[in-house]
Amino acid sequence: MASLLARMGNSRRQNAAFMPFAHSMLRALGRSLGPLIANIAERNIQSFSGRAELGPGEETFENWLSQVHEVLPDWPMSEEEKIKRLMRTLRGPAREAMRLFQADNPNLNVAEFLRAMKLLFGASESSITAHGKFLSTLQAQGEKPSLYVIRLEVQLQNAIQAGVLPQSEANRTRLHQLLVGAELSRELRTKLKGLLQMHAHNEQENLPDFLELIRMIREEEDWDETFLRNKRPRRSETVMERAASPVVFQGSLPIVIGSADCNVIEIDDSQDDSDEDVILVEPEDPPLSSPGASSLRGTASTQEEMLIIESPDDFDEESPSTSSGSGQRNNGPGDLGRTRKRKYPIRCPHCGEEGHAKETCDNTSNKGQVFENLIVTLQELTHMERPKPSVPY
């Protein structure tokens, strides 16, 4: 073990002394291999002459340009040296043309060199084709206006390079084609039309350029998305959910009032509900029959549960009492004629039959009858009878 540790210590001391020498060797190797790698990359570029008929070892302009873009990242040298290497790949008319262009532009860089090559030898569209493509560029179905403007800008620049449209009219032409080919909101369309009209009357009024137009459209799109995301339906409860839960309390809790004959549950409506009070009457014992009670209750059965809906407008106005000083509701015979009560029998939500509740139901489930009863009740609740006009005294 001691001998092994001694050997490890000796190797570390030797490596520490060797590290500076290794770094210097790698740097020298990189400096020597850099030009070699560049020469190898240059040899991968075929020559280009610009002639219609290709000679031996020559490439078309598109292939030559593709090879140049592949080897440029492997050239760690100055712009001037890169242009010299590119010139060595040219032959014939192409070399002569770029030599004259370089003489007129001594500070030429690689990007300008390649741009000049594209203008001289690249395939260019005719002016009629470029103009037709620009005018026929319309917004696709489901495409956002901001993406359409970006696609339109490409065709606009092609038309400008073809000489169809002047650069000074780019903003006006872009804005006009946007109004023709895009589906915009009413507010944004009105705003852009106003800018065009102001520019037509006064050319000193500046029109938005490409970036400003993109910003305006993106702001409108963000506002529309926020509005649609925050918009919620007023009532999202479905009919089947209402069937499963006939009464949903959204406001205050119901008030239970006990009496000798029945339990009366009065439901306070919230502001979103209708202007009618819903009262559920559950009889405990059959009330004693009397002529007055029979005339008031009509043909309704005394053994069944009833749903009574009274509109607050139907209640009589409270009149102050002269004896006690507290207001109470008039219950005279004349007031009964003005009170309108709509009675709807409550049916069992399990079998759909009348006269009993779900807790005491012994019948089999009949969802079809329950759903039919629900539709009828909803139709009756929706089409309330209109109040008759009051007769002037």
Swiss-Prot record:
Biased composition (Polar residues): 291-300, 320-331
Zinc finger annotations (CCHC-type) as residue ranges: 346-363
Molecular function GO labels: zinc ion binding
Domain of life the protein comes from: Eukaryota
Keywords: Metal-binding, Zinc, Zinc-finger
Ranges for region Disordered: 281-300, 313-341
Family note: Belongs to the ZCCHC12 family.
Protein name: Zinc finger CCHC domain-containing protein 18
Species, as recorded: Mus musculus
